[in-house]
């Protein structure tokens, strides 16, 4: 039985508004653009994304099956790149997203605001938003940041796996102990533009520093709870508490080494060349535990979904592509999540945060 049918049977007396909220899943992070670079050098004539495509997590039929009505498409340049090379690769990624959307106008609609997300949903199309992954892609230039915004980018992850010159990464040796003065300027300019400040990938000190600087709600586009799995990419409880005070949202990733402590240990062994043991199984309930934890610490208004599909070589077997969101939502329903709360998780919270960022930009004039 589909998750929506389960909820309507279990919560049949809830409001029609709450049920309508369930029709919308807005995911915070998907790396299809990079997967297509690797698969076919962005050539949409070689890979038909209107059909099921083996070897990747994402295509239009599976987005439809997963009840996805909004997607932040990550535009990514490896953090080993810098300067003009990182800018060019990022622009190529933006170009791919825009061509992808234009190629399938009956299924996809470019969105740059909360109202455009809602309008796309009303027209039966998947709202397609753009998120920059890694502040190295602006080459230490607020002018480049502004151009990226003009091309449709509506969030920027401040770092990727390596430090930016102005912000420390979670997975690199700390240099600054937070943001530099230019890093603070980046956050303020993002506020002025209406771009969401994304704190996935950054060090815990940058998380705290950025939350102290930003005038608009921040996001974690694809992270989990560090109290459950103690890896640098996850979010400590004190930061979740600060995020709630900020009005922001932590969008939970499906990446197994963020979700499961045994898998994180196994994954670390693989990276060190230790072989022989099979990968621990990561379940839907493991992921649901992180969502429950963020709700319990930060509140129902501050949790969302950011799967990171096509951004990880591993995914939980039950959540192995974009068609599988209903399995997660059914598991949460079985735990007692109401239709209204599931609506906040799926779309209500991120739409609120988008609107708040827009309001902050308008207040800046």
PLM regions with names:
Residues 1-176, 230-365:
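N-terminal hydrophobic targeting/anchoring segments and the immediately downstream early-domain regions
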């Amino acid at each position: 039985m589909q998750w929506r049918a389960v909820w309507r049977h279990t919560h049949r007396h809830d409001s029609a508004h709450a049920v309508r909220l369930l029709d919308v899943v807005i995911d915070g992070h998907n790396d299809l653009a990079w997967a297509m670079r690797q698969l076919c050098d962005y050539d949409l004539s070689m890979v038909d994304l209107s059909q099921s495509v083996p070897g990747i997590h994402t295509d239009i039929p599976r987005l439809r099956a997963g009840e996805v009505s909004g997607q932040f498409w990550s535009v990514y340049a490896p953090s080993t790149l810098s300067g003009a090379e990182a800018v060019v690769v990022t622009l190529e990624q933006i170009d791919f997203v825009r061509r992808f959307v234009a190629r399938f106008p009956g299924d996809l609609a470019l969105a740059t605001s909360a109202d455009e997300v809602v309008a796309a949903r009303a027209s039966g199309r998947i709202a397609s938003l753009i998120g920059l992954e890694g502040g190295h892609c602006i080459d230490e230039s607020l002018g480049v940041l502004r151009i990226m915004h003009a091309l449709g980018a509506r969030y920027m992850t401040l770092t990727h796996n390596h430090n930016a010159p102005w912000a420390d990464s979670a997975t690199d040796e700390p240099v600054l102990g937070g943001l530099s003065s230019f890093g603070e300027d980046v956050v303020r300019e993002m506020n002025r533009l209406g771009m969401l400040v994304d704190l996935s990938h950054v060090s815990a000190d940058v998380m705290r520093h950025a939350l102290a600087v930003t005038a608009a709600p921040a996001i974690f586009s694809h992270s989990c709870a560090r109290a459950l799995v103690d890896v640098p990419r996850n979010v400590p409880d004190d930061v979740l508490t600060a995020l709630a005070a900020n009005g922001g949202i932590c969008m939970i990733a499906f990446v197994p080494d963020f979700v499961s402590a045994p898998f994180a240990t196994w994954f670390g062994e693989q990276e060190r060349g230790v072989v022989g043991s099979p990968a621990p199984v990561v379940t839907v309930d493991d992921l649901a535990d992180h969502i429950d934890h963020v709700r319990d610490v930060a509140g129902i208004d501050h949790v969302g979904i950011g799967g990171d599909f096509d951004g990880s070589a591993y995914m939980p077997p039950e959540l192995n592509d974009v068609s599988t969101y209903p399995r997660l939502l059914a598991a949460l329903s079985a735990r007692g999540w109401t239709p209204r709360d599931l609506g906040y998780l799926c779309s209500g919270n991120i739409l609120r945060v988008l609107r708040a960022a827009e309001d902050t930009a308008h207040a800046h004039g």
